[in-house]
């Protein structure tokens, strides 16, 4: 299956030059339902949603949003001060938000994918948490592709006003039997003064999917933005480099990335943070477990203000003789008082550690899984995650317990 345009025999596209014609056209006629009553979904698909942390029929009062192919379903939050609305409808209700937030954190001319989203109808969600409102339970959203070789084009905007807090769990996935498709997303996050926004995103794709998320965040004074990303079943080709602008004084950002890579997959997962606010800080931590694909881990910290402090840590574990991991942590200082550090490590599991654990009664598979679990323990906040999602995350280490080649 050819998914790319080839410019030459020597240069077959890896992260760009996606052949849009290899996929079905984006469906423009989007249907919206302010209820899940009309949702027709198989039990197998419900289980897949739960595995990425999205339970559509629990008792949560924070609201829900599901984009299922070209259909949108959502529930109005039962908590005062939070709203979730399909983006196109939000622009009709609040015309001013388009001027204020639409392609302000992401450049519409960044590449072909942002241009594609810009030229299409606005499909996605608008979430806003009002001033000083603290949402104590996670809000669940999902982007579910259920048609073979389809194209999903999404634009999501999240706004946290001053002093607000929210944990957003988003599952992006394909139907259990699907092989391929193209998923394009623009996400824009605006974290107001003193607010805290945690975004937990889980990807679970079929073997021939191409995925292109384009994300930007703007963080104001004393605010915190945390991005947790898990890739459980990777796409055939995923490339993303989310950008965060720490605009305010004492603004903070943390990226925590965990991914598993398998044969014939390409994962280019990065993150760039511009520390423009005085005494702003950032931490980028990435862990990759490679079973035979190609992984590029990048992280760029830009210190542009007095007192800026940051650290980037990219590490990879090779579980097979095949596959590639490239760790590319980067630092750029444009202010004399910015202080930044980085580290990177790539290797295989030490057989001595496996032998030691076996001497304590574990078999080889259990020992390897335990070591990988420790490698992946990077301090991600798990409060509020459903048990199904916690089990999915644990499976990354358990899969590794099948041994090395």
Briefly describe each language-model feature range.
Residues 370-371:
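Short alpha-helical scaffolding segments that buttress acidic/His motifs in well-ordered protein cores
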């Amino acid at each position: 299956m050819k998914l790319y345009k080839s410019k030459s025999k020597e240069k077959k596209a890896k992260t760009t030059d996606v052949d849009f014609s290899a996929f079905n056209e984006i469906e423009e006629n989007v249907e919206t339902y302010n209820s899940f009553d009309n949702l027709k979904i198989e039990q197998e698909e419900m289980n897949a949603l739960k595995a990425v942390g999205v339970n559509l029929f629990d008792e949560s009062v924070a609201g829900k949003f599901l984009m299922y192919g070209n259909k949108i379903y959502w529930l109005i939050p039962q908590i005062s001060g939070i709203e979730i609305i399909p983006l196109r409808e939000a622009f009709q209700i609040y015309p001013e938000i388009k001027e204020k937030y639409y392609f302000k954190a992401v450049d519409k001319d960044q590449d072909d994918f942002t241009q594609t989203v810009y030229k299409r109808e606005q499909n996605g969600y608008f979430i806003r948490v009002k001033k000083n409102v603290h949402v104590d339970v996670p809000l669940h959203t999902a982007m579910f592709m259920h048609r073979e070789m389809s194209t999903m084009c999404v634009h999501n905007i999240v706004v946290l006003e001053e002093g607000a807090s929210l944990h957003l769990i988003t599952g992006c996935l394909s139907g259990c039997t699907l092989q391929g498709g193209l998923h394009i997303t623009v996400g824009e996050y605006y974290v107001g003064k003193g607010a805290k926004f945690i975004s937990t995103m889980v990807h679970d794709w079929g073997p021939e999917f191409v995925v292109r998320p384009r994300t930007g965040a703007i963080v104001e004074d004393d605010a915190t933005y945390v991005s947790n990303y898990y890739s459980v079943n990777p796409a055939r080709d995923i490339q993303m480099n989310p950008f965060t602008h720490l605009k305010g004084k004492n603004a903070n950002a943390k990226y925590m990335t965990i991914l598993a890579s398998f044969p014939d997959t390409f994962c280019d997962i990065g993150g760039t943070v511009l520390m423009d606010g005085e005494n702003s800080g950032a931490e980028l931590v990435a862990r990759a477990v490679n079973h035979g694909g190609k992984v590029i881990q990048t992280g760029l910290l830009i210190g542009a203000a007095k007192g800026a402090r940051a650290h980037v840590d990219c590490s990879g574990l090779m579980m097979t003789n095949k596959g590639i991991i490239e760790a590319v942590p980067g630092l750029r200082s444009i202010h004399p008082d910015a202080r930044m550090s980085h580290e990177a490590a790539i290797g295989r599991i030490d057989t001595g550690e496996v032998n030691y654990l076996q001497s304590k009664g574990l078999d080889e598979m259990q020992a390897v899984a335990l070591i990988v679990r420790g490698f992946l323990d990077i301090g991600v906040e798990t409060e509020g995650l459903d048990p199904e999602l916690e089990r999915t995350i644990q499976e990354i280490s358990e899969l590794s317990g099948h041994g090395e080649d």
